Swiss-Prot record:
Pfam families: YcgL. Residues 97-110 have a biased composition (Polar residues). Residues 14-98 form the YcgL domain. Residues 88-110 are annotated as: Disordered. This is Protein YcgL.
Length: 110
């Protein structure tokens, strides 16, 4: 009897390598391979500064990321080879305060 070998189809695991910007606080660059910035535009790299390795992360089997949408990261990595995570916009505490004061006064007028 002849033995038949069935080749295993291995799906390519999706990993990303995350770098912290040396020039911009809370700004991170996700790429597919360690130290491979070949698909990142030169202007972006110039503004990003010297990339500082933050972590390597498997994306498969993960449901979410801390400060980025997982599906957007995966899509950007496969389509353009990188994903840029910018810091969240600063809170406008004055606007929040005025909004809450306005709400409180409208309730007091009733």
């Amino acid at each position: 009897m002849r033995q038949v070998t069935i080749p295993l189809i291995q799906s390519k695991s999706m990993f990303c390598v995350i770098y912290r910007s040396s020039k911009r606080d809370q700004t991170y660059l996700y790429v597919e391979k360690k130290d491979d910035f070949s698909r990142v535009p030169e202007a972006l790299m110039k503004g990003f500064g010297q990339p500082q390795l933050a972590m390597m992360l498997p994306l498969d089997g993960r449901k979410k990321l801390v400060n980025a949408e997982l599906e957007k990261v995966k899509q950007a990595l496969s389509e353009q080879g990188y994903y840029l995570q910018l810091p969240p916009p600063p809170e406008d505490l004055l606007k929040q305060h005025l909004s809450s004061v306005g709400q409180n006064t409208s309730h007091a007028d009733r």
